Each structure stands twice: as structure tokens, then as C-alpha cells.
């Protein structure tokens, strides 16, 4: 039985996706910069974690006043997966969109998926229209629902055990599908 977030998906395409997923991501564990970033996130210093994630993503470092640093840090530490709406106000900061914001959250929590145009295209191929609009948190929320539905629907043999977050495995698999 399909989770509600996957209604409309092609059963054949889903089966095909999960049958090839292990092959699509077999080299994913070899991404040293990603791994080093993932394992560099320790402790509770959300601002330090954001800086590490931004470095991985080749973003210009932020220069925020102390009060804004505290607000961002509290927001990042307070939100619980799969919630996304509570972070929408952070998108008013210069050069912060859904993509950048949820790269922070991916590394902070290991569960939020990284938002990419290519992964949204992969979902489209599965019969799950998922727009990519980094300026609209609602489209990212839909993306999270789709990824979560895939996690729930995945057959045991379809999700390889390679030491990476399942959200990352699915994101990379969708990009390469």
C-alpha cells in the first residue's frame, strides 16, 4: 500500500527505481567532502554547524549581528522533522533560500533532504510532480513529504546500507535516475 504522499506515482516506476537504487548510489560513500562535513557536525553549536555546511556548499560566509545569530541558532535547534514552516522567516535573510536553509538542516539533523532540481526531476519521472522553487518553502515541504513517502515505501533490499542518511541516499538516487 502506498503512503498518501506517493499517490499518483507509477507503481512500475517505483519498483524500477528501488531495483536500481543500490547501483545508482554505490559510489555515494566515496564522496569525502560530504562525509567529512557530515561527521564534522558535533555538539550543539548550530552556528558553527551552519558555517561548516556553508563551506561544503561553497557559500559566502555570513556576517550577522549577535542577535540575529542567536535567532538563527535557536530556530535551527528548535524545529523538528518533518516540519519546515517554522524556518520560513529565515528566508528573509540575504542569500538564504530553501536550498541553502535545508542544507544547513540536513547536516544539523541528518534527516532533512537536500533540495535539488535534479531530485525533483527524478520524482517527476516516478509520476510525482514536485516543483523546484528554492524561494517557496511550500514546494520544499512537498519535496520532504515525497522523500518521506519513499522511505516508508522502500523495500528492504531497495535501500542500501552504506552509512549515509536515507534522505541523502534517496536524493542522490533521484538525481541519477
Go through the PLM ranges and name each one.
Residues 47-94:
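Helix-hairpin-helix/helix-loop-helix acidic hairpins
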Residues 17-18, 29, 39, 62-64, ...:
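Phenylalanine-focused residue identity feature
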Residues 71-74, 99, 103, 131:
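Generic preference for well-ordered secondary structure
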Residues 85-126:
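Catalytic DNA-binding helix-loop module of base-excision-repair DNA glycosylases/AP lyases
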Residues 24-25, 75-79, 109-110:
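A short, ordered amphipathic alpha-helix with a cationic face
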Residues 1-54, 116-177:
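C-terminal accessory module of base-excision DNA glycosylases/AP lyases that mediates lesion recognition
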